[in-house]
Amino acid sequence: ETQQMASWSSGTEPDPTEAYVPNYFSINEQTYPTTLEDPNALVSVALGDTCWIAIANHGQMDHILHFHGFHVEVLTSNLQPTRIGWSKDTVPVKKGEGMTVQLVANQAGIYPVHDHNLIAVTNAGFYPGGMITQIIVDP
């Protein structure tokens, strides 16, 4: 869709045979650094809390989310049910997938969360951007 909009704004017809190449990636409609200002795009919890994070990949590519400082447990997944029960710091999320992960906030601090798919941590090719946020654990 981004490609089509760029073509339309330049007065040319989009080529439907060209591959769609996204260049903006977001968390709850925010891209880094605004993800750090939006309470819906970051995780803020107290030390000792257990929180559940809902993840929905509505995009056209797979993503690999890396949670610094924590392992998250996969509680639900509509496309990868064999991963339920996994406890990892890096979780693959397929296009069209919805999942819920559980995080136990067992250490205070500020920890990054980002996509390991390098294009997804850019805004129109500029780093840093895109799918980067934080987990804030207050003591």
What are these regions (language model features)?
Residues 1-139:
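Copper-binding active sites and cupredoxin-like electron-transfer domains
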